[in-house]
C-alpha cells in the first residue's frame, strides 16, 4: 500500500462500511452527496439516486455527515476524523469571536 493512502483507505472504508452519508466537494466547487459504495486507487463510486464514478484527482474535500472512527497504520495519526478537525474548527471560531 502506498504511504499516501495509509490514512485515506481506512477513512473511506469506514465511510463505506458504516454507510455514512457524505458530501464530496470537487475542485471546481461542485458538491456531490451520497454514500460511498466502493473505491480504489483512482476513483470513488458514489451512490445516491444513481451511481457516479468520481475521479479522486477531481476531489477537494470529503465531508461525512457524522463523526467516523477509523484506524490508521500511521503512527501518531488521529483515529477519529473529527478529532483533528475539531481543533481547526475551534481555532477558526475563536478567531471569528476575537474580531
Curated annotation (Swiss-Prot):
GO terms for cellular component: cytosol. InterPro entries: Hfq (IPR005001), LSM_dom_sf (IPR010920), Sm (IPR047575). Keywords: RNA-binding, Stress response. One of its GO terms (molecular function) is RNA binding. Residues 9-68 form the Sm domain. SUPFAM superfamilies: Sm-like ribonucleoproteins. It holds the Pfam family Hfq. Residues 70-93 have a biased composition (Low complexity). PROSITE patterns: SM. GO terms for biological process: regulation of DNA-templated transcription; regulation of RNA stability; regulation of translation, ncRNA-mediated. It comes from the Bacteria. Residues 64-99 are annotated as: Disordered. Homohexamer. PANTHER family: RNA-BINDING PROTEIN HFQ. RNA chaperone that binds small regulatory RNA (sRNAs) and mRNAs to facilitate mRNA translational regulation in response to envelope stress, environmental stress and changes in metabolite concentrations. Also binds with high specificity to tRNAs. Belongs to the Hfq family. This is RNA-binding protein Hfq. The gene is hfq.
